[in-house]
A protein has these predicted regions:
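Substrate-binding/access-modulating region of protease and related hydrolase catalytic domains
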Residues: 1-66, 90-93, 107-126, 224
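Extracellular fibronectin type III
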Residues: 486-507
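Solvent-exposed segments in extracellular or luminal domains encompassing
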Residues: 377, 383, 467-472, 552-564
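Conserved aromatic anchor
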Residues: 339, 425-437
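Secreted peptidase-domain scaffold signal
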Residues: 174-236, 244, 303-332, 343
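Beta-strand-rich modules
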Residues: 468-491
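Hydrolase catalytic cores
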Residues: 99-166, 293
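Extracellular/lumenal mature domains of secreted and surface-exposed proteins
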Residues: 502-564
């Protein structure tokens, strides 16, 4: 196990507990291990931090450990849920670490059902899943070797989308997790490692290109575990500073943890951090050239201390992140178009095409300059014609800079599927027709996935059907679904339906058998009587002499006696 996801509580604002100590030590001893925790759902509680209700209410000392990741609950549009627990940690450190969607998340229930849930317990596994994707990316880039978890935490924190006050804060931590930005850091090798001892300095050279809108630089280290109930959990204290080409020096973000609600809600400033085991420097519109990041071993009683430095360079480019191609959208539904872009002074223009870019249609020509999403009502029709297309794309433009879906996606309605019957030998599936569909793909649950069973060409009727051979006659129940297709583009599958065999309504497969009566006369005429079962409806007799019959009980005359 290298990534865990856990959402249990253990006290509110419990401080640096023995469990926090154990987890910090465990992560330090197992270099690839990452523990992800929910921050808690006590956002409105007063847990004794000293600032009243709404602050210092992370639910468990283990979630306040230095080397773990604690996750806040965000809505679909990146707002903090009111119930999401907030920092600081008991000693003033930044918690939670990052946020992710945890509001109105669909999840499974017993008896093959779903429901919607809200809480940091829903956000936490999302972050663990994001970590798994980044771990896999690192392995593919580095000879299938697991990454060091201190690097991965540094990547995730430094690439998060800033929310709330500029820089880190005690509500959102370092922002909303952004896997695409994290992947970019790994793919472009925008990280370095170092090792430092008491009182020493280490320099890292960074070349910042022209046109950079913002640079974020972070240094993170898995800190040695502190003693249980330590008033200050940080053991090895590193400090960073950034020197520009002109010689000016920038210090990292710091927050004031004074137990006062107004102070805790104050934006971060730049200064010296002696509480946290991560430090970040942000510069907007930096002068291009060579920068020097200096890491100082201010207090390293247990050295040498390994650390990682990551940097993220943001330009004026726009990256459309959804829809990017291959999706199946439904006419009339709302979809969040999403993109990554650095703040600018120009609004965005959003457009869509349903004919592979021949014609573009305005969605909105004045989307806010700081927006990164737009709630789009997928069109039901265009110029009075119902929309059913496999040639749709979205385009976003700002001040002459543009990006669009990497490939076409499909817009088509969803059929309503049901199973008429399922028998040991065959299955009969029916569904409602969809406007504009050229054909339909019928799927059945295999060992892991919904496997395509057949494709049925649209017949133009209001209902469609498929008769399938049953590949699993001994399975007690099966799951089926259908999606509409427009040429090669697939729409969304209908929610799968469960069907169980009902042998009482299934006809048994016919088994051929017959009885031969004695010859009626010396002429060789023989009477055959059908003795088959399974409700046969058609017969084909072969008398062995080149003659056949379609009668149920035929008579046949042989010229000479012979075996039949």
């Amino acid at each position: 196990v290298i990534i865990t996801s856990k959402s249990y509580s253990n006290g509110c604002n419990a401080g640096y507990t023995s469990l926090a100590k154990d987890l910090d030590e465990q992560i330090r001893l197992y270099p690839s291990l990452t523990h992800v925790f929910s921050a808690g759902n006590d956002g409105n509680s007063n847990c004794g931090y000293g600032a009243g209700a709404g602050w210092g209410n992370v639910t468990g000392g283990h979630k306040q450990a230095k080397n773990v990741i604690a996750v806040a609950n965000l809505t679909q549009i990146s707002n903090l849920a009111g119930s999401s627990s907030r920092g600081p940690a008991a000693d003033g450190r930044i918690k939670p670490d990052v946020g992710a969607k945890g509001t109105s998340v669909n999840s499974t229930l017993p008896n093959n059902t779903y429901d919607s849930f809200t809480g940091t317990s829903m956000a936490c596994p999302g972050v663990a899943g994001c970590m798994a994707q980044l771990y896999q990316a690192y392995k593919e880039l580095n000879g299938n070797v697991n990454p060091p978890s201190d690097l991965m935490k540094c990547v995730v924190l430094n690439s998060a989308d800033d929310l709330g006050n500029p820089g880190p804060d005690f509500k959102h931590g370092w922002g909303e997790i952004n896997v695409l930005k994290g992947l970019s850091i790994l793919e472009n090798n925008q990280y370095q490692s170092g090792s430092i001892t008491q009182g020493s300095d280490e320099d890292h050279i960074l070349n910042i290109p022209a046109g950079t809108k913002e640079i974020n630089i972070m240094v993170y280290w898995h800190d040695k575990e502190a003693s249980t109930n330590a008033s200050i959990a940080l053991v090895n204290d590193l400090d960073i500073s950034l020197t520009s080409p002109s010689g000016s020096v920038t210090l990292p973000w710091v927050l004031d943890p004074t137990p006062n609600s107004s102070i805790l809600n104050t934006p971060a400033t730049q200064g010296v951090d002696d509480l946290n085991n991560m430090e970040q420097i942000t510069i907007k519109n930096p002068t291009p050239g060579t920068y020097i990041l200096t890491v100082n071993g201010t207090a390293v009683p247990y050295g040498p201390q390994q650390y990682f430095m990551t940097y993220e360079i943001q330009s004026s480019e726009i990256t459309l992140t959804y829809p990017i191609g291959g999706e199946g959208l439904v006419p009339g539904e709302f979809e969040l178009i999403r993109w990554d872009a650095t703040d600018d002074s120009y609004p965005f223009v959003l457009e869509y095409t349903i004919d592979n870019g021949i014609n573009w249609n305005i969605i909105n020509n004045n989307v806010g300059v700081n927006s990164t999403f737009y709630n789009w009502n997928v069109p039901n029709s265009l110029n009075g014609v119902p929309v059913a297309t496999d040639a749709a794309r979205v385009r976003i433009t700002r001040n002459g800079i543009t990006d669009e879906s990497d490939a076409n996606f499909t817009i088509i309605d969803v059929p309503n599927v049901s199973v008429n019957w399922i028998c040991p030998d065959s299955i009969y599936v029916i569904w409602s027709s969809v406007t504009g569909a050229t054909d339909y793909e019928v799927s059945m649950l295999g060992q892991k996935y919904m496997d395509s069973m057949t494709t049925v060409v649209s017949n133009g009727n209001t209902t469609q059907s498929a008769l399938l051979l049953n590949p699993n006659p001994n399975i007690l129940d099966s799951w089926f679904s259908v999606c509409a297709k427009k040429n090669d583009g697939k729409g969304r599958r209908d929610v799968a339906v469960n069907a169980q065999p009902n042998n009482s309504s299934c006809a048994a497969p016919p088994v051929a058998n017959f009885i031969v009566n004695d010859p009626i006369s010396c002429s060789g005429e023989v009477s055959f009587q059908d003795d088959s079962y399974g409700q046969p409806s058609n017969w084909l007799w072969n008398f062995g002499d080149g003659n056949t019959s379609n009668l149920e009980n035929p008579l046949h005359s042989y010229l000479s006696l012979r075996p039949v």
